[in-house]
Amino acid sequence: MDDDSTESDGPTRRTYMRYCEAVVGGGLLAGCTSNSETTPSPTESETNSSTDASTNEATETEESSYTVSMEPVGTVAFESVPERWIAYDGAYADMAVALGQADGMTGIGGADRYYTAVYDELPGVSVDRETIEANPEVRTKEQFYELENDVHLYDPEMLINWFDWDRDDVDEIATNVAPFLGNLIFRRSDDWHDYRYYTLYEAFETVATVFQERERYEAFAQLHDEFVTVIQEGLPPADERPSVLLTFEGADEPEAFSPYRLDDEGTSKKQWRDLGVDDALAGTDIENLSTTNRGKLDYENLLEIDPDVLLVRGHERASAAEFRETVLAFMESHPVASELTAVQNGQVYRGGYLHQGPIQNLFLTERGAKQLYPDVFGGEESDERLFDRQRVADIVTGDR
């Protein structure tokens, strides 16, 4: 377990400001002042895709038609750029919004896990909540027929394994309404998902190809790489970083938790991997939450692991203060939970979205950096901004 002493030789907020100055010329960080025009080279490989490594290909077959490839569907032909679209989860919806396609959204597969509050911080960026609320759980053939979309950003294998579809149902909608194109990427622990996975930015690149928005994708990829580079350069040495346990439990008075392994590499854990944390489950035989594994850990189990930081998903509509006043307060008064190091040090935080797209990931990475390394990046509720909201908004709205 890492020492939590403030008398550390690791980076301080002054150290971070030097990194801030290094990229202010590129508009990455707001609120910094510097004459420096130096921009660090990205070290994050997430967005460095190539033709050989990625199936995000667009092949012109006629002047206006093109094809896009993604497992498990394979190659899909488009006669024109889709105007009406729907996504199953918030990650793919966020990708389409990032590409300037918000007006074409007709609904979503799961509105309860599509968090749109982040758009409030981006001038000119929004989604129509009435549309989402009118079609919040689009999962049946009848709904797909009714909405008449031009593309369905759904993994059809997910429909088969979670919602009792069969192959004929998928083929029927793909033939009579519009194709499916999507891959369930938020975790990598489901036995039925025996085909290729994609990183967040590989999937984003594919969606960009669907909407023929290469320039917007590349602008986001550049911003992302610069942002992650700056954050990683500000991190403490590896042996001074906290051990982190990521869990799910939506109750305000939680008694048991579903565990996540960070080495699962699903996109829902991307910010924690980028922040270089030590997975508290490493070296244990505890398995990642999946379709078949619904096991939970009680407080006695958590005490055996005793992470420096405990992250709890399921509270993303609560503010940091509301989370502390409910979940953390309950743990502090609990006879067993109160013995946890994370509880005693007040290091129990919201764990981030289950489904995150490129816009959401920027906000979640910023929040995670402030949660885990407040001496460097400012506390969770500080006014520090680690990326430029206006730059993001300009990419989305096309004003870059």
Question: What are the functions of these language-model segments?
Answer:
Residues 1-400:
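Terminal disorder- and signal-encoded targeting elements
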